[in-house]
């Protein structure tokens, strides 16, 4: 982390995703099914830039330099840990990252916003197509030496919240069965 502090204006790597225990438990408790994860893409636009800019520094995804791949990897991890992942499953989850932004410019609070369209298909038929979003806030600082590393640390929590909102949707879980 100390290296990040002195490297303002440089490029840093986002932390690798770490599965949420609550998300994994929700998937475990959601019934008998298996799923595979298809491709996730990103829709470029304002609020969805790659890399993410943090006060003159840029943060890249550790997964093929793609935040869509970050979300894809997150779902793979959580389905795998819940013993719901199967490469030959009929249900396939895919999606499009629509918004992905961190703001570390606040005096005392940092924020993150993420939005993605999630699609579940079985044998080519779309059973689920919904947009989910999440907002995350954390204590920050006016000092970039504090704010930038903290924003980087908080990114996986933002993705965990996005997936929690997806798994809380009974229609998503029903489409997997």
Each predicted region: which residue ranges?
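A structural "domain/chain start" motif
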Residues: 10-69, 73, 171-177
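Short secondary-structure boundary motifs at beta->alpha junctions and helix caps
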Residues: 51-64, 125-168
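Surface-exposed short loop/turn segments
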Residues: 11-22, 81-129, 133-149
């Amino acid at each position: 982390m100390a290296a990040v502090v002195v490297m303002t204006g440089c490029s840093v790597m986002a932390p690798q995703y770490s599965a949420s225990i609550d998300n994994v438990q929700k998937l475990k408790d959601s019934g008998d099914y298996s799923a595979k994860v298809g491709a996730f893409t990103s829709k470029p636009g304002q609020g969805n830039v790659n890399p993410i800019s943090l006060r003159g520094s840029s943060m890249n995804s550790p997964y093929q330099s793609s935040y869509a791949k970050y979300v894809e990897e997150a779902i793979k991890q959580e389905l795998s840990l819940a013993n719901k992942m199967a490469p030959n499953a009929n249900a396939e989850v895919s999606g499009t990252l629509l918004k992905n932004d961190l703001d570390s410019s606040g005096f005392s609070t940092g924020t993150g916003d993420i939005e993605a369209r999630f699609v579940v298909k079985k044998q080519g038929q779309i059973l689920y197509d919904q947009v989910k979003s999440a907002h995350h806030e954390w204590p920050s600082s006016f000092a970039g030496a504090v704010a930038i590393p903290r924003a980087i640390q908080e990114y996986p929590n933002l993705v965990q919240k996005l997936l929690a909102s997806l798994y809380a949707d009974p229609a998503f879980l029903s489409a997997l069965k």
